[in-house]
């Protein structure tokens, strides 16, 4: 909040117009990649996915290509995007770098096998094994991702499919035959076999709507669908462009935190916690 870390157990007290600085998430993703290489912990991949889809993808204006400095979490608030000539923040520099990194962190490998961490259409070649993995999906618009193996000769190795913590009943098929999934959400589904050219894997991860409360206030919740944090479509009425750096006294100046998100709290989501 306001470019500073705070006690993570006091999240509900920091839902403002200055949350989610993009440079911070940029560096947290970089740190997460290193941590995963050291630990192989699937919870790190879960975090990476949530940050990637909810912050990095949400940072860019799909119409103009401009990007945000902050991602406001205040109910009823809206995002402010940079402009081509008057607004250039640190989050513009790292912001555009972010959007050149979608090919990172999808796959990892060690001596035991290859890890699939993200469900993004892509292709990876493991040269030492002579194996190529092609992934096809429209996730998160669909719950299924599909893989095709390319190999000049049979390769014995393990494919580790991330079993996200947000999915409860994963279904995996290899060449059309169901694989027994004994692992629990928040782990990896390990498939070890002699992989041949044109072998196919299909993994389906059902998504459902869930409520996630802040750690310090059970009455403040986020609404999620799978890894996606949902937000209402409110249109563009009342939105204003950010002020240029040369005018720090402007009403929406980021640099002195004088800007107040024009939040209409009447649009806040109200949930009956007894009957969610």
Language model features with spans:
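Beta-strand-rich binding/interaction modules
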Residues: 154-175
């Amino acid at each position: 909040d306001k470019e500073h870390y705070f006690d993570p157990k006091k999240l509900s007290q920091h839902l403002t117009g200055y949350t989610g600085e993009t440079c911070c998430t940029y560096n947290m993703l970089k740190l997460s990649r290193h941590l995963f290489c050291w630990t192989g912990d699937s919870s790190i991949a879960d975090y990476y996915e949530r940050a990637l889809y909810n912050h990095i993808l949400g940072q860019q204006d799909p119409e103009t290509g401009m990007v945000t400095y902050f991602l406001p979490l205040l109910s009823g608030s809206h995002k402010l995007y940079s402009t081509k000539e008057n607004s250039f923040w640190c989050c513009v520099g790292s912001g555009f770098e972010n959007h050149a990194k979608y090919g990172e962190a999808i796959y990892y490998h060690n001596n035991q096998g290859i890890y699939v961490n993200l469900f993004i259409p892509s292709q990876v070649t493991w040269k030492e094994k002579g194996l190529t993995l092609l992934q096809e999906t429209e996730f998160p618009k669909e719950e299924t991702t599909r893989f095709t193996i390319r190999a000049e000769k049979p390769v014995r190795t393990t494919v580790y499919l991330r079993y996200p913590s947000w999915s409860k009943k994963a279904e995996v098929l290899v060449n059309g035959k169901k694989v027994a999934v004994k692992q629990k959400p928040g782990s990896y589904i390990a498939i070890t076999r002699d992989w041949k050219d044109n072998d196919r894997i299909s993994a389906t991860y059902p998504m459902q709507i869930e409520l996630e409360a802040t750690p310090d206030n059970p009455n403040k919740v986020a609404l999620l669908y799978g890894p996606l944090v949902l937000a209402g479509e409110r249109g563009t009425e009342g939105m204003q462009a950010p002020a240029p750096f040369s005018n720090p006294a402007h009403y929406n100046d980021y640099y002195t935190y004088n800007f107040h998100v024009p939040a209409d709290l009447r649009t806040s989501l109200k949930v009956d916690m007894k009957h969610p």
